[in-house]
């Protein structure tokens, strides 16, 4: 065991033993080589299932960077322009009472969290958030909270809906499919990197409370 591996393992074991973390994994690469691959604690407190090297974790907003990478791939190929309005690719986006304003919102502004659409539909439930069609229709009618580009505000949820729909309109594939085919597969991580996990890997997912 390398010194880095041993030190990392000791730190995360201490965190789980003291109850600061319930379960976690840590991996680190140096010059393309995996130098730390450590895990500790519980993946599921109800069943007692422990974290191991195959455990999958819901990474929430870490997927924003991966989604943005897909946009950059499309831009590099010339199929998407950061500075064109979103409505150029998704015409219905510029709808609703603020249609004229939304017609000016660019792909770049959406990527930079300056589009003015960080809010969610009133009373939206978790199931509603997962309904991409419902969110798409709502975003088409939604009014920006500020003049696009004037302010920055974290689009915690709507980033994925907006950028995901732009990608689908440009490429025809979902973000998840592009990630699987053009990022995860070439990098050899098809069994551990998903945007929309396959049902057959659900048993490996850590349970969040």
In which residue ranges do the predicted regions lie?
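Short, conserved catalytic-motif segment at the N-terminal edge
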Residues: 1-59, 141
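Short amphipathic alpha-helical face segments that pack within enzyme cores
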Residues: 65-70, 158-166
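Active-site helix/loop module of the DD-peptidase/beta-lactamase fold
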Residues: 53, 58-62, 74-118, 122, ...
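Cytochrome P450 catalytic-domain "roof"
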Residues: 142-149
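Amphipathic alpha-helical interface segments
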Residues: 129-137, 156
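Cytochrome P450
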Residues: 149-158
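Residue-level signature of the cytosolic catalytic core of signaling kinases
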Residues: 4, 82, 103, 128-131
């Amino acid at each position: 065991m390398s010194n880095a591996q041993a030190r990392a393992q000791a730190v995360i074991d201490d965190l789980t033993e003291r109850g600061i973390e319930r379960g976690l994994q840590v991996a680190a690469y140096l010059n393309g080589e995996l130098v730390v691959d450590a895990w500790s604690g519980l993946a599921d407190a109800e069943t007692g299932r422990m974290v191991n090297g195959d455990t999958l974790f819901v990474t929430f907003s870490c997927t924003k960077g991966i989604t943005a990478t897909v946009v950059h791939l499309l831009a590099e190929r010339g199929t998407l322009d950061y500075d064109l309005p979103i409505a150029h690719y998704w015409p219905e986006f510029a709808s609703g009472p603020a249609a004229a304003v939304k017609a000016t919102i660019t792909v770049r502004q959406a990527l930079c969290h300056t589009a003015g659409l960080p809010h969610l539909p009133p009373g939206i439930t978790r199931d509603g958030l997962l309904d991409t069609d419902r969110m798409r229709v709502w975003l088409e009618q939604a009014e920006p909270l500020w003049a696009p580009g004037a302010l920055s505000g974290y689009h915690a949820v709507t980033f994925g809906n907006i950028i995901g729909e732009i990608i689908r309109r440009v490429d025809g594939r979902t973000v998840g499919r592009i990630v699987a085919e053009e990022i995860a597969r070439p990098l050899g991580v098809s069994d551990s990197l998903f945007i929309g996990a396959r049902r057959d890997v659900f048993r490996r997912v850590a349970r969040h409370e």
